[in-house]
């Protein structure tokens, strides 16, 4: 398995309030969260990724050389991102540097193509969350032969705001039957919210779909703010008769906004990833 961490966004929500906390002047993945960079909490959620000092023996074990980060070249020049990442993880990690911000998360993720084997599985994960990944690991290990992907999800708050991408499952099962980005209609059907990590049992399932949507310029999301998102690629797989499974996680923490981070610091009893 390859694990890809796209972190080539601008992180403007923290930058706008940097006068409140000197940490917010840093690139978001390196903001200090209980003594660890935020990105370390995100990768620590992936229990099968062998971090420095660990000695994993499970069948899903992913070594450091299979970890890929996607960063902005400008950020690297300003903040030595590559150097920091290698200090946190290993000199064996892979770094992709982009000249500019892309047209969305799916296009950013696609920039790791050179490191992906079309027949090998891949997991894409945001760098600004923390979750209990045990069930994700179990579902990946037990997935059916026809399963094209696994999406870790959680039960969203019932506040009527469609702020996530969503996965609707067949009643009484983990079988996903519909996926969409920030879709109020799907949310109102009782869909789970996607946490921002996406597993494909073969990288080609991702690569083929993202290449097609970019070629046709099929953007997703709210009107006027369309981007290339990863979640809608799964709906394309469903439309082709492929199967998807949801991994319903018991504990999920967003870290991507100042409000989310403050809530995590005040309420999460876990002190290290």
Where are these regions (language model features)?
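Alpha-helical elements of Rossmann-like donor-binding domains used by nucleotide-donor carbohydrate transfer enzymes
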Residues: 45, 110-111, 138, 232, ...
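Conserved N-terminal catalytic core of the sugar/cofactor nucleotidyltransferase
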Residues: 1-8, 12-24, 31-32, 36-124
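Conserved beta-strand termini and adjacent loop/short-helix elements that scaffold enzyme active sites
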Residues: 70-72, 96-98, 152, 182, ...
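A short acidic, often aromatic-flanked loop/helix-cap motif at beta-alpha or helix-coil junctions
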Residues: 100-105, 158, 252-255
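Conserved alpha/beta core of the MobA/IspD/sugar-nucleotide pyrophosphorylase nucleotidyltransferase superfamily
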Residues: 191-273
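The conserved acidic donor/metal-binding loop of glycosyltransferases
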Residues: 126-130
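Conserved core of the sugar-phosphate nucleotidyltransferase
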Residues: 132-215
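Conserved beta-strand segments of alpha/beta enzyme cores
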Residues: 29, 92-94, 175, 243-245
């Amino acid at each position: 398995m390859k694990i890809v961490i796209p972190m080539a966004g601008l992180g403007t929500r923290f930058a706008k309030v940097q006068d409140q906390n000197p940490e917010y002047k840093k690139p978001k993945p390196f903001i200090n969260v209980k003594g660890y960079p935020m990105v370390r909490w995100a990768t620590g959620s992936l229990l099968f990724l062998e971090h420095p000092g660990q000695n994993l023996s499970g069948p899903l074990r992913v070594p450091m050389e299979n970890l890929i980060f996607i960063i902005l070249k400008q950020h690297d020049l300003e903040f030595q991102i590559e150097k920091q990442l290698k200090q946190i993880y290993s000199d064996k990690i892979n770094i992709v540097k982009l000249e500019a911000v892309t047209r969305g998360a799916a296009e950013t993720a696609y920039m790791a193509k050179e490191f992906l084997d079309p027949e090998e599985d891949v997991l894409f994960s945001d760098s600004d969350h923390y979750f209990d990944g045990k069930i994700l690991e179990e579902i990946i290990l037990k997935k059916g032969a026809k399963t094209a992907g696994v999406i870790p999800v959680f039960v969203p708050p019932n506040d009527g705001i469609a702020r996530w991408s969503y996965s609707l499952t067949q009643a009484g099962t983990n079988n996903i039957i519909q996926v969409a980005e920030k879709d109020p209609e799907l949310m109102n059907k009782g869909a789970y919210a996607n946490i921002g990590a996406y597993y494909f049992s073969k990288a080609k399932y991702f690569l083929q779909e993202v290449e097609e949507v970019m070629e046709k310029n099929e953007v997703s999301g709210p009107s006027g703010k369309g981007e290339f998102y990863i979640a809608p690629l799964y709906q394309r797989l469903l439309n082709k008769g492929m199967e998807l499974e949801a991994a319903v996680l018991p504990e999920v923490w967003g870290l991507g906004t100042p409000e989310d981070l403050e809530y995590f610091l005040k309420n999460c009893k876990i002190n290290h990833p």
